[in-house]
Regions:
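Long, contiguous binding/interaction regions
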Residues: 1-101
Length: 101
């Protein structure tokens, strides 16, 4: 799997919601704040199902109602198209899980 170039990563991030490039870890990341712990856990479960379907898995750090997603392709050593695709799917699931208002 081919790594994305800097420009490709920057362009991909423009299409995503709240993601940033973590250059130090050669990954993209997003932190989401949910209303409470259980809604965060439900979100993590829905993302886990999507990750299994895609056979591509984000690193997830859960701190009460805050979840940080780190996305990279470990076997490739950085960010690939697969990472951008899963990040877009995570965005969809977050939008579905976060109450409007």
């Amino acid at each position: 799997m081919a790594l994305l170039e800097e420009q490709q990563i920057a362009e991909g991030l423009e299409r995503l919601e709240g993601w940033e490039w973590d250059r130090e870890n050669n990954a993209i990341r997003r932190t989401v704040e949910m209303p409470d712990f259980m809604s965060g856990i439900h979100l993590v479960a829905s993302i886990a199902r999507a990750a299994e379907e895609a056979d591509h898995h984000p690193d997830m750090d859960i701190r009460y109602n805050r979840i940080t997603f780190h996305q990279s392709t470990h076997s490739a050593g950085g960010v690939t198209v697969q990472d951008m695709e899963l990040a877009a799917r995570i965005d969809e699931l977050v939008a579905d899980a976060v109450p409007a208002g």
